Each structure stands twice: as C-alpha cells, then as structure tokens.
Amino acid sequence: MEKSQGYLELDKSWRHNFLYPLIFQEYIYALAHEQGLNRSILLENTDHDNKYSSLIVKRLITLIHQQNHFLIFDNDSNQNPFWKHNNNLYSQTISEGFVIIVEIPFSPRFVDSLEEKKKILKSNNLRSIHSIFPFLEDQILHLNFVANILIPYPIHLEIVVQSLRYRVKDASSLHLLRFFLFTLNKSISSFSKRNQRFFLFLYNSHVYEYESTFLFLRNKTSHLRSTSSGAFLERIFFYGKIKHLIEVFANDFQAILWLFKDPFMHYVRYQGKSILASKRTSLRMNKWKYYLVNFWQCQFYVWSQPGRVSINQLSNHSLDFLGYLSSVRRNPLAVRSQMLENSFLTDNAIKKFDIIVLLISLIGSLAKAKFCNVLGHPLSKPARADSSDSDIIERFVRICRNLSHYHSGSSKKKSLYRIKYILRLSCARTLARKHKTTVRSFLKRLGSELLEEFLTEDGQVISLIFPRTSSTSWRLYRGGIWYLDITCINDLANHE
C-alpha cells in the first residue's frame, strides 16, 4: 500500500480532490494505450518519472481549441482528412486519459488502501456478475412480483456533467469533460464507438446518482422475514450449499444462520436494464412503477414512459438476463413429522429457483461468430497461415472453458456438453482445412490429444479447489456453482 501512495499522493492538490494535474502525467496515456505498460504500474511502479509532461498534453488541448469543429466534424469531402484524423486522435487520447484519472478514486485497491487505517472490511466478491444469482436464490423465492425496467438515458449531455460533479470536486476536470461532450456533439455517435469506456463511465456515474436516492427510500421500508415452516423448507437448497462449504471452510462461515429484516423491494441492475422484485401486491408495484417514471422526469430530467416498466408475476414468468433463463418452479416434498409416539407425513409444495442455459441462444451466438450454422452444425474457421496447430487448439479450448466457466451455475449441464461438441468439431474442421485434408483422417492422425483438451470438466477444477472431500465437490458441481471472480460478461453469453 505504501507503493500505491507513491503514485497517488503526487502533491497537496490530490488531497483536495484536484484531479486535473494528473492529466499532465505522461504515464497516464501510456496506461490508456497499453504501450508496454499495464494498469498495475499505477499501483506498483513508483520509480517511474513523476515530472509533469505538460508540453504534450497542452499541445493536444491547444490544437483542439484551435480547430474549427463545425468544419472538422462535418462530412465535407473537401476537408483535409489529415486534420480530421488528427483532431479525432487528440480528443480520443485525452478522453482515454481522463477516464483513467477519474476512475482512480473508485479503484478497489485504492479504496482499500485509504480505508486500511479505519479497519473497514469489505467484500470485493460483490463486484462479480455471478454474485447476483446467489442473491436471487436466497431472496426471490419469497417474492411475488417482478418489474423489468429499461433504464432511460439523459436527454442532454449537461445532465451527465451535473451528476458527476457530486463525486468529482475538481472544477477544471468538469470543464474539460464539458468541453469534450459539447465540441464532439456532432460526431458523438462515432466518438462513442471508438471510446466506449469513456461513455460507459459517464453512464454508470449518472445511473448511480439516482440509484443512491432511490435505494435510500427503498431501505426505509422493510419487514421481518417470515419464520413459517414453509419458508424454511424453501431455503433448504440454499442452506445446503452453505453446509457443504462449511465442511471445507469451517472458519469462514458462521455456525448460526440468522434471520434479518427483509426489504420490501429488491433491486438488481445489468446491461442498461434493472429488475425490481417485491413481496407486495400488484397494486403496490404499479404505484412504484409510476413513482419511478415521475422520479426520473422531475428529479433527474430524464424522459421516460410507463411502457419501459413491465410488471409480471414470478409464478408464471421467467427472467431472461445475463445469458441465463431463471424461473421459480414448485417441487413436491414429503416431510415426516414426529409427535410423541405418532408420526405422519405431510405433503408440501415448495418453491425452487431454477436456472438454465438456453441452448438455442448459445447456438445462435456461436453461429454469429461463425463456429456453426443456425442449426448447430460445426463450421471451420479461417486460420492464419502463420498460426500453429497448438495456437488454434488453445484458442478453441480457451473459448470452451470460458463458456463453461461463465455458465457453471446452470442446473442442467447437457447444453454445455453440446456446446463443447460444436467447438471441438469446429476446431477439428479448422485444422483439417489448414492441412487440406478431411476431418476423419486428421482426427485419426492426431489421436486423442484434441479430445483430451476439451474434456477438462468443471468438476475436476472444483476438486482442486475443494480437496478435502470429493463428495462435496461433486454435489456442488451437480447443483451448479457460481464463480465470484467474473467481472465481465462473456461475449458469447451476451445474447441481448
């Protein structure tokens, strides 16, 4: 942590939340462009030159100011393409550096270093995409209605700047941000495609502002979770997972599972959408629906319509998001009760949260990437002439393992086996196409080596993580397991 402070405590201005001086640091742009450096330099390499490279950045900012943007960004063929290219390059360079700087206060390692003195312990696992699904397994069974929300976009760029000023206290940085947004307004679509990280940060910061206000109101309403026998029966699957984990990590879990107060509303955001689930009635959910629309329009000047919020009952509705199809289904369960000398069986219908992977969607994603056709028949991929066989195999195996890793929480593994088959045969056809031979003869010559590369199951990986009991790893693998190190959506898993 001492090394991290060597970079982040550049001078007294940093203590006053002045980010603008960092724009003149040369290593910021090396980080942005990944020219021989990576993001770890910011926190690990303190021997780098700390002098301000003001000449470089001032030249970029000055050249942008001197250009006639109404001519440069116009699609006039008479304009010099050299100046247009340079101007876009200057803007993109500074904007990439700007994002690197503004993200520093939100860096997990930086926040941990600042809070180390306060002894504040935080779990970074909640940053994982897969952390959403254990939450749903534990909470959604007790809820009745779910609202699918399309998050609206701000109608004016100045709203984004006003939202960010609550977090960034440096006026100079905000003026530079405003300069980017308004001077690039005519070519905002092309600029956003070249620098998606810049606009993704602005979007998340804007959404965070109204989410913090909305969640504050949501946390004011809560009720005690039901302690009926039916509620405990519905949680046996979730408690079962914790029980298996306690066998391995005995010191990391509490022996007693406490009951806490349960909020009326549960909120999850993903990919420009959000889910609002509640135990209340349909009438109360519709009130929240119109409250959200008015809240967006009146408080944050965001145009929205009631049609962007759809309310459904969980018992007959499935949630399709993040590459999974989630639903609540009822399972029969017989419970034996003992009362003095008499025993009797009671039939119960408990709710279980079921998560599956849609095979059709996965095949559609593979077909879009040219690994197969729309019917799921494997195709050969064009291989570079200088690519070795091992490089081609490693590429296919990496894609296969990433998909298996991302979809490991599925309760049905047959879909993943079909995907592995498609990728394995597509790899064989790609290699056969490269060597100008048939797939049969190539597999006969290669032997079982290609097959072994694709047969590394997740269960074998879990057995390495949980070495104490093989039965524990097998139960976890059969029921699905969530990895809390996944922080981005797999491209082939993003069907929306």
UniProtKB/Swiss-Prot annotation:
GO cellular component, as recorded: chloroplast
Keywords: Chloroplast, mRNA processing, Plastid, RNA-binding, tRNA processing
Protein's UniProt keywords contain tRNA processing: yes
Biological processes annotated in GO: mRNA processing; RNA splicing; tRNA processing
Listed GO MF terms: RNA binding
Subcellular location(s) of the protein: Plastid, Chloroplast
The keyword rRNA processing is assigned to this record: no
Chief localization: plastid
Matches recorded under InterPro entries: Domain_X, Maturase_MatK, Maturase_MatK_N
Family: Belongs to the intron maturase 2 family. MatK subfamily.
Protein role: Usually encoded in the trnK tRNA gene intron. Probably assists in splicing its own and other chloroplast group II introns.
The protein's name: Maturase K
Organism: Paeonia cambessedesii
